[in-house]
């Protein structure tokens, strides 16, 4: 006995003041415990049960505990078992469960007292549907006419699917019968009511008669018959106390049942304890009554008291502050309580994000999530939840997660991977990879319909089950088609099987190639030849008698769009076709979580398919795996990394996550006043237990919700969603007023006070100290400052740049990432080496960040000054070191009058490294300068003056750093350096006036006159192809191949050059090449507009067209331009007969979001897509 007292004292010591008062309250009286979110209501309930058992010695079988779900009941049993361990208490005798499960146990024992026959059972939902359909089919005409008349009392009709005619619908009949049973009204009693509906009375009577014939009860009968039993007979005379969890979610008959449970053998109810929160009542569509707290006080036959719990153990104080501002907006029908108090606080408030276009919201949320996930050893994907008000919001979020390769799960919902079309396409791909999958064979044969019926499918299944022990399933199918295996299959069926086999074998041929490019064709062929494409574009939802041939393909079909999304996922890694093998392998490794490196390995199409199916394991239900050892290890690894949770707010009730995102905080979604919540939520958001699917209140207790009541319900739902968050909370919406047809307006709940309590970005990344504080609160260890792979400071900088760029692209290692597949979140420190395949912008940022010159800064953001719709920084700073870019002066951004596209010949206008070929066929590498101050590869580089096309123009060459010319901005000069024999480099520099003519030195340091290299200058300035350039040099110097490729002496060069006559070279003009006999001057100036005008400008990129290549400052802002400007920039001005492009007025918007909004408004009737070059 003393040991039990010690145990009880130990339990009490773990409670706070309010919790202790609730647990120790007089058990003979009534008690209301108002428990806000995170205040420990389950702890109070279990402690009170333990108090009744240990202190008052009440036997467990004399206590009833009701919960909202069976899952909650099982969790409570486990807690009590742990709390009372060693006390000698048998918790299994405790009567605990949902109202339906408790009523079921009572009726099993005492059902005969209300005329229930022996061996009755619960009827299946499918049986109910059959009964209802049969009733509707046989309904008399007068009842059918009455149901559709204006004199009806209850609506039982809905529009038919294939027309505008209104017909009696079984769903509405079932709903109305459920309401009658919830009020414990039998059919004969309802018919005697003077206000009854004739049609509903008819259906109710027939329905109940059919149940009696089958000796069955439905779930509503459980409550109704128990209520009738307890009002007649006191069968629960032993009950001494009743506890009800989630009291705010109870309806009228459940409140009455609570009083009947507690009555026991007494004329009045005995002890009752109810726990709940009126602010969390969100099941009005099931007619749960938030005012049941007040109703209990009105009906309670005994004295009762109220205790309010205010100590919150879940959320930070800033999250509680925002939720308190929200819930106190309700002025009527709510009892004020003390605000909740958190046990900790953080320096960063909840984040409110507003987007100008709906399609930007989901991807931006996912990128925010990735930055948080990147914090080492802090979060797993299990720590993130995205809560939606409506299920139609899930599609975009799911697509964004798939595109970013983030594993996810949907609580009690159907994910993209569960859809029929996705499963069908995956089955076909499985057969291409391994044709021995029996399930995939059967499913692909039967869907889409090809003339192979279920009976034939069953015969094929039996043959596969019987014969597949020694022979592959696909071979058995081939034997069936060729009649080697005799089955009673129609001729048409064999033809279908033969076509199916042919399709699989033909598509398998594409896997024999070593090239990955055929995978797109493979996907398209499977989609078309299988009949899925025709099914979704033409037949889906149409009858056979429709004229399918004349109809247009429905490209907006939801199933077809899902196939396109699957294809994008399937071909995601192929999008990096220009990447190195190393980059591809890293991307595959990141996508499939492969632990072993796969570098220097050529990936075949078959291996790509294997990696694709492995990557499906990112999604909790995307792939069905066998329980092999390797799969078990992979499963453990995936569970450790976790899954992002997607759930409706209803489904999230009672759960919590460290980080919560709530998208769609706008009118029409939150609040959603006129939505059919019953249709949207009830069937999928309830617990798997069927007994919870029928909780409708009685008509007497139910009133039609007014708009004000609906708004209060929506506010409570928003409150529940916010209080699921423990540390970080994000709210977001889309606000667009330009769309007149459907403007998007911020939620009315987002008042000025609420927005002031939030921030527009995550303040966690303002400083590394804030990040470390979060680590301390979560009892996690932050990465060391000298960590070789990860830097918190770099992550903070990337995130801030991400916010500055309006969350349009992920920024990683200071680089804007258009493709996030290859990002390794565990590594963000810049390494010394870079990939051979890189963009100019990436190379510039890398070299700038690694630069040893602190005075050279990278322009990350500046207020844009608009020039003809293009943007450039107002101020110019010294440019960073640049590896792959033209080296000329830095001027303004381009306008329509001046096109600064780099009009270099193909020898220099190539962004990646190229190789020139000598006459012997050997590779001669073309070298670019690593930076402006880099030295030549040779021990001594030679600097030479160029002679060229313009005899009246003069320029000088220098190895000094580029300096802007004060007068001649469009003039550039080129230096040609020899590194070794046969290896050379061309450099472009500003026109810089020198006091002395340049000198050239050989390896020995001897000076050369510029005239000695006149022939070489001619070759460089007049050649169009690299091979011609080498041949000209070779011919001009009169060197053999061997001499050219060997390290010849400078004396030999002088001798050869001295014997040559100086030749005059005429300026290069259109359609006429220079002749070798022309005279060459010592000095030359190359005019961008004269010499380079005839180059193939269509080989330039969009960035080169819209940004001045001479401007070496790095501008990270997106390119916005109209088609006219792009076309004019790419077109040669000298082409007189070119087709003109229709002019389009220059845009007047200042940023990308305004551009998108205006484009959307202008193309409101256009179903096409807006293309943005970024």
From Swiss-Prot:
EC number: 5.6.2.4
Domain UvrD-like helicase ATP-binding: 14-316
Keyword DNA damage: yes
Stretches assigned to the UvrD-like helicase C-terminal domain: 317-654
Binding-site positions, ATP: 38-43, 314
UniProt keyword annotations, A-Z: ATP-binding, DNA damage, DNA repair, DNA-binding, Helicase, Hydrolase, Isomerase, Nucleotide-binding, Nucleus, Phosphoprotein
Biased composition (Basic and acidic residues): 956-973
Catalytic function, reaction form: Couples ATP hydrolysis with the unwinding of duplex DNA by translocating in the 3'-5' direction; ATP + H2O = ADP + phosphate + H(+)
Residue numbers spanned by region Leucine-zipper: 222-243
Keyword Oxidoreductase included in the entry's annotation: no
Top-tier EC class: isomerase
One term under GO cellular component: nucleus
Biased composition (Polar residues): 909-922, 935-955
Family: Belongs to the helicase family. UvrD subfamily.
Other observations noted: Present with 5190 molecules/cell in log phase SD medium.
Name recorded for this polypeptide: ATP-dependent DNA helicase SRS2
């Amino acid at each position: 006995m003393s040991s039990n007292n010690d145990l009880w004292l130990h339990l009490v010591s773990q409670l706070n003041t309010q919790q202790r008062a609730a647990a120790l309250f007089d058990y003979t009286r009534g008690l209301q415990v108002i428990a806000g979110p995170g205040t420990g209501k389950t702890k109070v309930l279990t402690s009170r049960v333990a108090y009744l058992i240990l202190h008052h010695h009440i036997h467990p079988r004399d206590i009833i505990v009701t919960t909202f779900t069976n899952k909650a009941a099982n969790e409570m049993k486990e807690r009590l078992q742990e709390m009372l361990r060693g006390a000698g208490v048998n918790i299994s005798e405790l009567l605990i469960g949902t109202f339906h499960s408790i009523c079921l146990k009572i009726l099993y024992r005492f059902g005969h007292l209300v005329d229930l026959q022996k061996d009755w059972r619960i009827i299946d939902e499918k049986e109910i549907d059959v009964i209802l359909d049969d009733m509707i089919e046989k309904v008399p005409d007068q009842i059918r006419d009455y149901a559709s008349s204006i004199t009806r009392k209850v609506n039982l009709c809905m529009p038919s699917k294939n027309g505008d005619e209104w017909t009696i619908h079984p769903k509405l009949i079932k709903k109305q019968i459920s309401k009658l049973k919830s009020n414990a009204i039998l059919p004969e009693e309802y018919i005697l009511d003077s206000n009854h509906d004739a049609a509903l009375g008819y259906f109710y009577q027939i329905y109940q008669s059919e149940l009696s014939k089958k000796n069955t009860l439905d779930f509503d009968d459980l409550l109704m018959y128990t209520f009738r039993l307890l009002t007649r007979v006191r069968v629960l005379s032993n009950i001494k106390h009743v506890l009800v969890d989630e009291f705010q979610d109870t309806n009228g008959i459940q409140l009455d049942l609570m009083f009947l449970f507690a009555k026991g053998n007494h004329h009045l109810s005995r002890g009752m304890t109810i726990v709940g929160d009126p602010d969390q009542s969100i099941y009005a569509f099931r007619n749960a009554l938030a005012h049941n707290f007040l109703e209990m006080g009105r009906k309670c036959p005994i004295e009762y008291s109220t205790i309010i719990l205010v100590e919150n153990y879940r959320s930070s104080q800033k999250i509680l502050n925002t939720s308190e501002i929200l819930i106190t907006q309700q002025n009527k029908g709510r009892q004020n309580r003390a605000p909740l108090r958190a046990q900790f606080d953080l320096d960063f408030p909840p984040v409110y994000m507003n987007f100008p276009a709906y399609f930007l919201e989901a991807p931006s949320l996912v990128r925010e999530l990735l930055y948080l996930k990147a914090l080492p050893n802090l979060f797993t994907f299990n720590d993130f939840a995205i809560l939606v008000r409506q299920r139609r919001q899930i599609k975009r979020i799911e697509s964004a997660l798939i595109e970013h390769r983030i594993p996810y799960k949907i609580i009690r919902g159907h994910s993209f991977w569960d859809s029929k079309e996705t499963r069908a396409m995956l089955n076909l791909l499985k057969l291409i990879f391994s044709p021995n999958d029996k399930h995939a064979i059967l499913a692909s044969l039967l869907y889409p319909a090809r003339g192979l019926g279920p009976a034939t499918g069953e015969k094929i299944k039996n043959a596969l089950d019987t014969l597949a022990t020694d022979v592959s399933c696909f071979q058995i199918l081939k034997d069936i088609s060729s009649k080697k295996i005799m089955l009673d299959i129609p001729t048409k069926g064999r033809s279908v099987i033969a076509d199916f086999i042919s399709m699989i074998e033909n598509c398998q041929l594409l896997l024999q190639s070593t090239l990955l490019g055929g995978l797109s064709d493979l996907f398209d062929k499977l989609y078309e030849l299988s009949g899925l494409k025709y099914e979704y574009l033409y037949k889906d939802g149409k009858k056979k008698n429709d004229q399918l041939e004349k109809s247009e393909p429905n490209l907006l079909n939801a199933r077809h769009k899902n196939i396109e999304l699957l294809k994008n996922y399937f071909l995601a890694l192929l999008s990096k076709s220009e990447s190195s093998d190393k980059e591809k392998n890293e991307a595959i490794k990141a996508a499939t979580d492969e632990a072993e490196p796969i570098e220097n390995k050529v990936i075949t199409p078959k291996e790509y398919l294997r990696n694709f199916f492995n990557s499906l394991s990112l999604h909790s239900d995307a792939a069905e795996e066998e329980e092999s050892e390797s799969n078990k290890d992979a499963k453990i690894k995936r569970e450790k990394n976790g899954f992002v949770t997607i759930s409706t707010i209803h489904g999230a009730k009672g759960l919590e996550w460290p980080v919560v995102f709530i998208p769609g905080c706008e009118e029409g979604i939150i609040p959603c006043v006129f939505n059919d919540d019953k249709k949207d939520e009830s069937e999928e958001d309830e617990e798997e237990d069927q007994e919870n699917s029928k909780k409708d209140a009685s008509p007497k207790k139910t009133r039609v919700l007014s708009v004000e009541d609906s708004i209060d319900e929506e506010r409570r739902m928003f409150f529940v969603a916010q209080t699921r968050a423990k540390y970080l909370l994000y709210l977001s919406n889309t606000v667009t007023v330009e769309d007149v047809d459907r403007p998007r307006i911020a939620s009315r709940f987002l008042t000025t006070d609420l927005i002031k309590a939030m921030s527009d970005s995550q303040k966690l990344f303002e400083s590394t100290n804030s990040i470390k504080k979060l680590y301390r609160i979560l009892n996690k260890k932050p990465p060391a400052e000298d960590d070789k792979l990860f830097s918190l400071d770099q992550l903070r900088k990337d995130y801030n740049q991400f916010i500055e760029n309006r969350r349009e692209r992920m920024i990683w290692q200071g680089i804007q990432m258009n493709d996030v597949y290859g990002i390794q979140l565990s590594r963000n420190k810049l390494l010394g080496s870079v990939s051979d395949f890189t963009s100019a912008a990436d190379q510039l940022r890398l070299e700038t960040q690694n630069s040893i010159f602190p005075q050279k800064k990278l322009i990350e953001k500046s207020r844009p000054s608009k020039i003809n719709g293009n943007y450039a920084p107002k101020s110019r700073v010294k440019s960073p070191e640049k590896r792959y870019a033209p080296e000329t002066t830095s001027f303004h951004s381009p306008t329509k009058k001046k096109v600064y596209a780099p009009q270099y010949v193909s020898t220099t206008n190539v962004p990646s490294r190229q190789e020139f070929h000598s006459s012997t066929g050997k590779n001669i590498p073309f070298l670019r300068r690593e930076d402006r101050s880099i030295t030549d590869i040779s021990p001594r580089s030679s600097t030479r003056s160029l002679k060229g096309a313009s005899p009246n123009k003069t320029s000088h060459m220098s190895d000094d750093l580029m300096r802007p010319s004060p007068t001649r901005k469009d003039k550039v000069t080129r230096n040609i350096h020899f590194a070794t024999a046969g290896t050379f480099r061309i450099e472009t520099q500003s026109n810089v006036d020198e006091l002395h003519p340049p000198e050239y030195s050989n390896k020995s340091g001897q000076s050369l006159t510029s005239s000695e290299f006149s022939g070489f200058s001619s070759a460089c300035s007049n050649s169009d192809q690299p091979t011609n350039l080498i041949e000209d040099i070779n011919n001009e110097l009169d060197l053999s191949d061997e001499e050219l490729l060997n390290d010849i002496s400078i004396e030999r060069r002088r001798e050869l050059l001295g014997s040559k006559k100086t030749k005059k070279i005429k300026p290069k003009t259109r359609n006429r090449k220079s002749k070798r006999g022309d005279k060459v001057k010592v000095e030359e100036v190359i005019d961008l507009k004269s010499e380079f005008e005839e180059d193939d400008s269509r080989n330039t990129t969009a960035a080169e067209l819209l940004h001045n290549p001479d401007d070496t400052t790095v501008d990270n802002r997106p390119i916005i331009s109209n088609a006219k400007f792009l076309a004019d920039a790419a077109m040669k001005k000298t082409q007189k007969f070119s087709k003109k492009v229709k002019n389009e007025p220059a845009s007047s918007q200042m940023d990308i979001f305004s551009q998108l909004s205006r484009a959307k408004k202008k193309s409101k009737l256009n179903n096409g897509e807006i293309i943005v070059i970024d």
